[in-house]
UniProtKB/Swiss-Prot annotation:
Protein's UniProt name: S-adenosylmethionine:tRNA ribosyltransferase-isomerase
Assembly behavior: Monomer.
Reported function: Transfers and isomerizes the ribose moiety from AdoMet to the 7-aminomethyl group of 7-deazaguanine (preQ1-tRNA) to give epoxyqueuosine (oQ-tRNA).
Compartments (UniProt record): Cytoplasm
Record-listed E.C. numbers: 2.4.99.17
NCBIfam families: PRK00147.1, queA
Length: 344
């Protein structure tokens, strides 16, 4: 397969720059297992779920990972913390006219100074003078995606975060979860739909373009995930009842499928660079709540694996014609796993 097979033209004005006025006031494109398309509103999601179904949500919390500082020479430095590796250490991407070398210092606001320890491939290991998360809360900015063109605001700090975010560590939001508010979660609970949690700390690699021509040549970035024992038990109970496992977002799906490498989902903590493309056989997830993804992206390949390439092409063409809003602050899809998972 060629990466060009996953390209499409998107009018720039369909890229959502701001969230809807009310969380959850989004549209929902329902794609059935047979490939039928239905235009709905996100508030209708409970009508698509049964009492025996299980929603699995990613409870990662976005950190203020973007930092601005100066080198001792006075040169400006922009940092994006990719991963917190210890209480006082982190790995970061650094943008500067001349990259600071090991032993150099980067000065942030309020006389906070970071020590450059060493390089690890494209990342730089940094030592912080105080706990990393404290420094980020004090000096950092929310790392909005590159296609959102405004500087982060207080509204973004609230809305670019799920209402159930709990585990700090992501540099991008698990955006399918942004549609859920407390009222929706209450409705689902009343209906008997259960929820469970996984954690996958979304890395900056989620925004990196695929730079190769052939899909098979792409190398995925690695991300940390946790699947609790309680979630594994909930999945087993759901299977016993005949219900569906519904992943909220591609990050939840990737965590569950990574933890299912043996054939069934297992509890644990790990790293995954799972790359899901058409032809992949899904082991755990039966349905998926997701946003609309970027052209030529690995996430578009993932949903094409889930629903079929031609079905996703039709769905995206329909969404563009009907002026759905795209990407992080955009509208959602509810995908039922294709009856036959084939490359077509």
């Amino acid at each position: 397969m060629r990466v060009a097979d996953f390209d499409f033209e998107l009018p720039p004005d369909l890229i959502a720059q701001f969230p809807p006025d009310v969380r959850g006031a989004s549209r929902l494109l329902h794609v059935t297992a047979a490939g039928a398309l239905h235009d709905r509103m996100f508030r209708e999601l409970p009508t698509l779920l049964g009492a025996d179904d299980l929603l699995v949500m990613n409870d990662t919390r976005v950190i203020k990972a973007r930092l601005f500082g100066e080198k001792d020479s006075g040169g400006r430095v922009e940092l994006l913390v990719e991963r917190v590796t210890g209480e006082f250490e982190a790995l970061a991407f650094i943008r500067a006219s001349h990259a600071p070398k090991p032993g150099a210092r980067i000065r942030l606001a309020d006389d906070v100074a970071l020590d450059v320890l060493d390089k690890q491939h494209d990342l730089t290991r940094l030592h912080f003078p105080a706990p990393v998360l404290d420094v980020l809360d004090r000096c950092g900015r929310l790392p909005l995606p590159p296609y959102i063109e405004h500087a982060p605001t207080e509204e973004d700090e609230a809305r670019y975060q799920t209402v159930y975010a709990n585990e700090p560590g992501a540099v991008a939001a698990p955006t399918a979860g942004l549609h859920f508010d407390a009222a929706m979660l209450g409705t689902l609970q009343t209906q008997g739909v259960r929820t469970a949690r996984v954690t996958l700390h979304v890395g900056a690699g989620t925004f990196q373009p695929v730079r190769v021509a052939e899909v098979a040549d792409h190398v995925m970035h690695s991300e940390r995930y946790t699947v609790p024992a309680a979630t594994v038990a909930a999945i087993a109970e759901t299977r016993a009842r005949g219900g569906r496992v519904v992943a909220v977002g591609t990050t939840s799906l990737r965590a569950l499928e990574a933890a299912s490498a043996s054939g069934s989902v297992e509890a644990g903590v790990g790293e995954t660079a799972i790359f899901i493309t058409p032809g992949y056989r899904f082991r755990t997830v039966d349905a998926l709540v997701t946003n609309f993804h970027l052209p030529r992206s690995t996430l578009l390949m993932l949903v094409s694996a889930f629903s079929g390439i031609e079905t996703i092409r039709r769905a995206y063409a329909h969404a563009i014609a009907e002026r759905y809003r795209f990407f992080s602050y955009g509208d959602a899809m509810f995908l039922e796993k294709a009856s036959l998972e084939t490359p077509a």
